[in-house]
Amino acid sequence: MDTVSIAWAALMVIFTFSISLVVWGRNGL
């Protein structure tokens, strides 16, 4: 894998994780 692919993969993971935190926070978990 090249650097761009790794950067995109990391960005998507962080984005998905932050979205999950927002959803869980609104649900009171």
From Swiss-Prot:
GO terms for cellular component: chloroplast thylakoid membrane; cytochrome b6f complex. It is found in: Plastid, Chloroplast thylakoid membrane. Keywords: Chloroplast, Electron transport, Membrane, Photosynthesis, Plastid, Thylakoid, Transmembrane, Transmembrane helix, Transport. Its main location: plastid. It comes from the Eukaryota. It is a single-pass membrane protein. Pfam families: PetN. The chain crosses the membrane at residues 3-23. The keyword Chloroplast applies. This is Cytochrome b6-f complex subunit 8.
